[in-house]
Amino acid sequence: MAPRNILIVSNPQDEHTHAVVAHLHKMGVEPILFHPERMGSDHTLSLFQSADPEPDRLILTIHDRKVPLQEMDAIWYRRPRLVTFESNSLSTEALEFARDEWKAFFESAWVLMDGCFWVSRPDRLRLAARKPLQLQVARQVGLSIPRTRITNDPQEAREFYDLCNGRVIVKATGSGWVYSADQEQVHFVLTNRLRQEDLGADEEIRIAPVTFQEEVPKRFEVRANIVGQQVLAIQIPSQQSAISSVDWRRYDVENTPYTAI
């Protein structure tokens, strides 16, 4: 039997969420849609813990509806955004403190809900977004990986550029999402070819770790999602377009049609 108590943790602008919710409605399932960015306005979250042997209780309030989260069968964690605050009276320091408190609370709450079926657990998603760990897992399962150097040392970057004869790409070490201070604007750091003139930007390189990789010529891309034991994969002919040749996420769908494999 399909799970009946489903919580979807997302953001209001996510079109994938809306499509899945509509499909669940057709199945006779009424999921609970939760946008964490609304905390502090008409959403609240409370955790009840005590010395008694009874299990912890997590109560989510959306508008005036109270939802016992321990009764959830399944949770879909789909790109929620950070909490935003309607009050303009908070200082920058106070806002940062409040966001850190929410982050600590949410991370703890999700771990406490380990009895649910997750797609996917936030702690696993965070690890999966880290390039060094991605490469380690790829190597462990037998995949070939390109030569990689992650550093904030400008000299190391220059040496790696020479080692790869100038065939180097640069990418984010983490997820690559960049949010504006008010959370209204979202940008994404894509993969780019490293130019020799970029290596003179010592101050910029020192600010944060950068992932440098040897560029490997490719015929096409494979995008795969695994749900349970099922692998859903598509082939993307990214090399058919100059727009998507370095990073397929510079979409040119008209000239690079996707096919299932």
Residue ranges and their predicted role:
Residues 3, 11-23, 27, 32-144, ...:
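Conserved N-proximal alpha/beta basic substrate-recognition cap immediately N-terminal to
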Residues 141, 146-165:
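Rossmann-like NAD(P)H-binding beta-loop-alpha module
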Residues 10-11, 36, 229, 236:
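Cofactor-binding loop segments of dinucleotide-utilizing enzymes, especially the Rossmann-like FAD-
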Residues 82, 123-126, 150-156, 174-176, ...:
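Short acidic/polar capping segments at secondary-structure boundaries
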Residues 5-7, 168:
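Conserved hydrophobic helix-helix packing surfaces used for dimerization/oligomerization
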Residues 24, 157, 162-260:
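Phosphate-binding site of ATP-dependent enzymes
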